[in-house]
From Swiss-Prot:
Polar residues: bias regions: 85-97
InterPro entries for this protein: Tubby-like_C, Tubby_C, Tubby_C_CS
Name this protein carries in UniProt: Protein king tubby
Coiled-coil portions: none
Pfam families in UniProt: Tub
Gly residues composition bias: residue spans: 194-203
Organism encoding this protein: Drosophila melanogaster
Gene Ontology CC terms, in alphabetical order: ciliary membrane; cilium; cytoplasm; neuronal cell body; nucleus; rhabdomere
GO BP terms: endocytosis; glucose homeostasis; negative regulation of opsin-mediated signaling pathway; protein localization to cilium; response to sucrose; sensory perception of sound; triglyceride homeostasis
Length: 460
């Protein structure tokens, strides 16, 4: 009994130290994590091999030794009856308490080790409990009987159970084919008004059409979702400070198609990224040069340009997007706030041509500052939901994001916050997912993601 009591005291001390460590980690700036992760997912091989649990909770648990759970006591009495089993009312309850303490310690160790693998920029985040998801689903199903705006999942290939088990963060809608040119018009929930009538809005996964250099600049067709993956290459002499980013379009059976590559220029007063569809030549003079991303001094505002010439009148340089991050001078904790301004769309789903290099017209940023919204579209990142139970910010990425990070975001329009124009998030140390749809093109979406990678003096 004295051995068990001393063991319990040690366990209690270790548990208090671990809880203090967790509270200290949670005091750092908040991050955003996907709220649709599996609650009881298996541990990775690295963590399971580094931890050894000496516990047995099977039907023969009552014959385990309290000092060494791996040892099975033999029958020592002449009648073949185990002397430990004769006192089951006391020793069995003691063993149960000991095993319960060990399991609690194991859960705390697993939680600590999982925090060390998360994004080092902010505090750990957990997932929403299953009963909260069910409560949210029942409320949504009651309201869905009335006609309202379309609310469909971002991942249309999920089965019915995955789609209906939405959490409180809300599910992203799917834009059906054949809708009006504006992506923010209301539609019926089942999509039958547009002839789809399949319950998922008829949205399909996009594929490359035509040449790569033309495809990456063309706005996504309505009713098409492009699922992409961004990999960060930090290997080499100077790629620790100037990594190269590669954008691939995901296809079936693990296949992928290269779309764009991006690199930060070394000799530049401000952050300046070159984007090219040629992965072997990421320079302004390359044939595959598609455009660039340029920031201001503080890293709070980014402008996306195409490959046009600023001095040319025949093919002037066009503004593709402006990304603005809210300043955080006082150091308030929480996720980032960003605003994305895009050129408006014409009736034939083409971008309005806006050039800040043309002295006869104003650029996207100037139009936005003057509140002239006739030819521009303003998007915002979807506000994450704060979960009091898990003490974390959560968003529903529908299985596309698996790690917490301050870089995780979803872009929506104020008139239809359920239509996810773009979402971006971390899946591993140097791998990120990027999904986009109308009215974005691959060049715009990739540049927005690059702005999230760049360091921001006044935002962190």
């Amino acid at each position: 009994m004295s051995g068990i009591n001393s063991r319990n005291q040690k366990m209690e001390q270790q548990r208090q130290l671990m809880e203090a460590y967790i509270r200290q980690k949670r005091a750092s700036p908040g991050m955003v994590q996907a709220s649709d992760l599996q609650i009881n997912r298996p541990m990775s091989g690295m963590r399971s091999n580094s931890r050894e649990l000496h516990a047995y909770d099977g039907p023969m648990q009552f014959i385990s030794s309290p000092q060494n759970p791996d040892q099975i006591l033999t029958n020592g009495s002449p009648g073949g009856i185990n002397p430990v089993a004769m006192n089951t009312s006391r020793n069995h309850s003691n063993n149960m308490r000991s095993l319960s303490t060990i399991n609690q310690e194991a859960d705390l160790i697993e939680e600590i080790s999982s925090h060390e693998l998360e994004d080092e920029e902010s505090s750990p985040v957990t997932v929403i409990e299953q009963h909260q998801q069910s409560a949210s689903h029942s409320a949504n199903s009651t309201q869905s009987q009335k006609p309202r705006a379309r609310q469909h999942s971002f991942s249309d290939n999920l089965d019915e159970d995955d789609y209906t088990n939405r959490n409180v963060a809300g599910a992203a809608p799917v834009r059906p084919a054949g809708m009006a040119s504006s992506p923010y018009k209301d539609a019926t929930l089942d999509g039958s008004s547009n002839g789809t009538g399949n319950g998922t809005g008829g949205e399909s996964e996009g594929d490359v059409i035509g040449n790569i250099d033309q495809f990456v600049m063309q706005p996504a067709p309505q009713g098409v979702l492009y699922k992409c993956r961004i990999t960060r290459d930090r290997k080499g002499m100077d790629r620790g400070l100037f990594p190269i980013y590669y954008l691939h379009l995901e296809r079936d059976y693990g296949k992928k198609i290269f779309l764009l590559g991006g690199r930060k220029r070394k000799k530049s007063k401000t952050s300046n990224y070159i984007v090219s569809c040629d992965p072997t030549d990421l320079s302004r003079n390359a044939d595959g040069f598609c455009g660039k991303l340029r920031s201001n001094v503080f890293g709070t505002s980014f402008t996306v340009f195409d490959n046009g010439n600023k001095e040319s009148t025949e093919s002037p340089r066009l503004d593709l997007a402006v990304i603005i991050y809210d300043t955080n001078i006082l150091g308030f904790k929480g996720p980032r706030n960003m605003t994305v301004i895009l050129p408006g769309m014409t009736e034939d789903d083409q971008r309005v041509k806006i050039s800040s290099a043309d002295p006869k017209q104003q650029g996207i940023l100037d139009l936005w500052k003057m509140k002239n919204m006739d030819n521009i579209v303003e998007l915002h990142n979807k506000t994450p939901v704060w979960n009091d139970e898990t003490q974390s910010y959560v968003l529903n990425f529908h299985g596309r994001v698996t790690q917490a990070s301050v870089k995780n975001f979803q872009l929506v329009h104020d008139s239809d916050p359920e239509y996810i124009v773009m979402q971006f998030g971390r899946t591993s140390e140097d791998v990120f997912t990027m999904d986009y749809r109308y009215p974005l093109c691959a060049m715009q979406a990739f540049a927005i993601a690059l702005s999230s990678f760049d360091g921001k003096i006044a935002c962190e």
